[in-house]
């Protein structure tokens, strides 16, 4: 019996639903068997609406019954609890525990909501952190690149600074050198200005001296004509004394040259650095050459043994021989046809002693003519270590006609 009750009791609970279900399914079952003219949907629609209303009313009734049963149960429990002190305390404790459980559940829900919020914030923060880490890594790479560029620029800047310092030092040296040059140029300009003043004075003296020399030349020409007439006769009588006389006259001329007023030094560089001297070396040599041109002793010349060339010769070389002094000294046996070895040896004056001798020269216009020569060394003056020499024909009448 209990088994039957246990099995059929749940089924009996839903007996109220049997009629609406049958009312709903019966038209559906009979619908295929009806003809087209007999198909009337009004019954079908009515059955559906009535079934729906029945379901609604049944559900509402069950809900009311459940609420009434619950209230009745609560009332009975409350009465039982009120009668029994132990149960009342248990109920109170249960209610407290339920309240606490409800509070804990609400707190748990709040914490769960907060946890979800924190989790969402954490996930968002984590995403932001990852994004920031990526940005930091990118910035770190850019920083490394910028650091490398900065190191390169710093190295280049140091090199430029060193180069600038080097250029500054070179500029300072150049400015110092330029200052020294300016001072030297200023001193040279002052000295050259003084030299020009001295030259102007000397030119003025030369102009007055030229006028005097013109008069002397006319007198010398007259004396030369007299000497041409008288000297040959004296030469034939005293032919052995003529070289000695030439050497004596040559020594007088050498004495004048050695003791002429010269510069304090024999080089142009020393002359420029001298402050007390105002005479130019070349100007003094020119003055000496002008004085030597006034001498009428014979073919007078000045020879430099080191350079093996003549630095001066008067015009008688061209007049008597027809050759210039360079042609005469360099032609060798073509012009000096006799006494050439002794002449070349004596011309060097290795022992710095006077020399005299005789050579035969082949002139252009007068044939072969013998000449006496005398040589002496200049020991001081602007032309020191130069050879002063003179050549004079044995017979001066060979040039007449």
UniProtKB/Swiss-Prot annotation:
Pfam families: PAS_12, UPF0242
Coiled coil regions, renumbered to chain: none
InterPro entries linked to this entry: UPF0242_N, UPF0242_PAS
Similarity annotation: Belongs to the UPF0242 family.
Protein name: UPF0242 protein CCA_01002
Record organism: Chlamydia caviae (strain ATCC VR-813 / DSM 19441 / 03DC25 / GPIC)
Lineage start: Bacteria, Pseudomonadati, Chlamydiota, Chlamydiia, Chlamydiales
């Amino acid at each position: 019996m209990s088994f039957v009750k246990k099995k059929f009791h749940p089924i009996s609970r839903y007996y109220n639903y049997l009629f609406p279900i049958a009312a709903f399914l019966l038209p559906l079952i009979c619908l295929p068997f009806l003809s087209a003219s007999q198909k009337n949907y009004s019954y079908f629609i009515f059955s559906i609406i009535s079934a729906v209303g029945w379901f609604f009313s049944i559900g509402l009734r069950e809900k009311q019954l459940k609420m009434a049963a619950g209230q009745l149960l609560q009332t009975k429990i409350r009465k039982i609890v009120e009668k029994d002190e132990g149960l009342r305390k248990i109920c109170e404790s249960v209610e407290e525990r339920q309240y606490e459980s409800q509070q804990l559940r609400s707190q748990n829900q709040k914490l769960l909501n907060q946890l979800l919020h924190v989790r969402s914030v954490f996930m968002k923060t984590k995403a932001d952190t990852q994004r920031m880490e990526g940005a930091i890594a990118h910035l770190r790479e850019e920083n490394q690149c910028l650091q490398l560029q900065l190191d390169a620029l710093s190295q280049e800047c140091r090199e430029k600074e060193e180069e600038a310092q080097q250029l500054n030092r070179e500029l300072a040296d150049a400015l110092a050198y330029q200052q020294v040059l300016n001072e030297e140029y200023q001193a040279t300009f002052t000295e050259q200005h003084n030299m020009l003043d001295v030259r102007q004075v000397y030119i003025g003296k030369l102009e007055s001296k030229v006028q005097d020399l013109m008069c002397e030349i006319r007198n010398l020409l007259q004396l030369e004509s007299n000497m041409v007439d008288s000297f040959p006769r004296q030469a034939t009588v005293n032919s052995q004394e003529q070289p000695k006389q030439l050497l004596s006259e040559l020594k007088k001329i050498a004495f004048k040259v050695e003791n002429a007023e010269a510069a304090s030094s024999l080089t142009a560089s020393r002359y420029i650095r001298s402050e007390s001297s105002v005479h130019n070396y070349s100007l003094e040599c020119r003055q000496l050459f002008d004085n030597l041109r006034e001498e009428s002793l014979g073919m007078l010349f000045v020879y430099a043994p080191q350079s093996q060339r003549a630095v001066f010769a008067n015009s008688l070389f061209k007049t008597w021989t027809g050759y210039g002094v360079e042609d005469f000294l360099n032609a060798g046996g073509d012009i000096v046809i006799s006494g050439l070895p002794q002449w070349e040896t004596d011309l060097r004056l290795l022992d710095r002693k006077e020399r005299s001798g005789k050579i035969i020269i082949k002139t252009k216009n007068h044939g072969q003519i013998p000449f006496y020569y005398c040589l002496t060394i200049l020991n001081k003056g602007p032309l020191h270590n130069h050879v002063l020499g003179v050549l004079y024909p044995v017979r001066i009448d060979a040039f007449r006609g």
